[in-house]
């Protein structure tokens, strides 16, 4: 999320080794230690060996979890992605996941080399960060770099990890800043907490109305980078796009505790997605 989720039981993984040929990472320039390739063969995991055993554990856990994440991501978008490589290291110098994640593009060609921040002792956060970038690859060049796509990628990460990144929440800041309208307009950046937060709260609201990410994600990709959340609302509900913001605002105002998380309507993880 620099361009800024539970793990299965432990499994036997390949012994780490230095890769002969490594991907071109967005920013990492150190040694890439190969940990292995997932059983399905779609995800190859590397680690920065200088971080020692805690980072290696993160990488091994990600390797064990990778196929589950890919399968969940494919189900959300209704498509199958391509092979990706991912490296676990201290992105931004952090080892608690707060360094986020990054990749160079929003498809499986330009964005298939993914960086994720190590999170010592909390490998579910590493899986969440991986899904945040993987979901952007599944957007196929649409939405990525926009407030709409950033909100969608964060919701995907939350769904596959049971909200392992609550400290990345932006909806409370959006509420504190006066709830600017990013439903009728899309912000052409993924770095604005207000526009991302508006999107997080809006998607929470849509899901509280019964729409799942498996419906929302393909609909957003179809609308594309020039689309708005109001258009998404219209396409899903068959109501007028002009009613999206007023209806959303009414729902926000009716919240008994206000906006205190990225999921103010309490939709939580969805088994259907």
Annotate each PLM feature.
Residues 94-100, 180-191, 267-270:
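Surface-exposed intrinsically disordered loops and tails
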Residues 93-100, 160-166, 226-231:
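Secretory-pathway/luminal and periplasmic proteins that interact with or process carbohydrate-rich
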Residues 70-77, 133-134, 138-142, 156-164, ...:
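Sec/Tat-exported extracytoplasmic proteins
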Residues 156, 196-249:
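Extracytoplasmic, non-cytosolic globular domains
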Residues 1-134, 138-145, 156, 243-245:
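Zn2+-dependent metallopeptidase catalytic core
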Residues 80-83, 124, 161-169, 209-217:
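Structural helix-adjacent loops and short alpha-helical linkers that scaffold large soluble proteins
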Residues 2, 13, 225-273:
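Beta/coil-rich, acidic/histidine-enriched accessory regions frequently appended to metallopeptidases
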Residues 69, 142-193:
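Post-HExxH zinc-binding segment in Zn-dependent metallohydrolases
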């Amino acid at each position: 999320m620099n361009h800024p989720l539970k793990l299965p039981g432990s499994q036997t993984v390949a012994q780490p080794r230095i890769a002969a040929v490594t991907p071109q990472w967005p920013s990492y320039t150190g040694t890439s230690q190969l940990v292995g390739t997932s059983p399905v063969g779609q995800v190859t995991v590397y680690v920065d060996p200088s971080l020692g055993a805690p980072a290696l554990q993160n990488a091994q856990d990600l390797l064990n979890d990778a196929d589950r994440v890919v399968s969940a991501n494919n189900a959300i978008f209704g498509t199958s992605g391509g092979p990706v490589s991912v490296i676990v290291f201290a992105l931004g110098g952090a080892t608690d996941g707060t360094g986020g994640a990054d990749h160079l593009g929003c498809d499986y060609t330009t964005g298939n080399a993914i960086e994720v921040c190590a999170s010592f002792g909390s490998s579910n956060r590493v899986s969440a960060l991986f899904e945040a970038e993987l979901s952007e690859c599944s957007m196929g060049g649409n939405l990525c770099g926009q407030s709409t796509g950033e909100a969608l990628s964060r919701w995907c990460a939350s769904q596959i990890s049971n909200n392992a990144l609550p400290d990345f929440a932006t909806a409370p800041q959006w509420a504190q800043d006066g709830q600017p309208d990013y439903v009728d307009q899309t912000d052409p950046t993924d770095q604005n907490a207000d526009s991302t937060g508006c999107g997080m709260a809006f998607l929470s609201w849509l899901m509280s109305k019964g729409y799942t990410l498996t419906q929302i994600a393909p609909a957003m990709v179809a609308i594309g980078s020039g689309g708005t959340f109001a258009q998404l609302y219209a396409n899903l509900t068959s109501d007028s796009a002009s009613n999206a913001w007023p209806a959303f605002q009414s729902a926000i105002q009716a919240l008994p505790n206000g906006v205190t998380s990225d999921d103010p309507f309490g939709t939580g993880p969805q088994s259907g997605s």
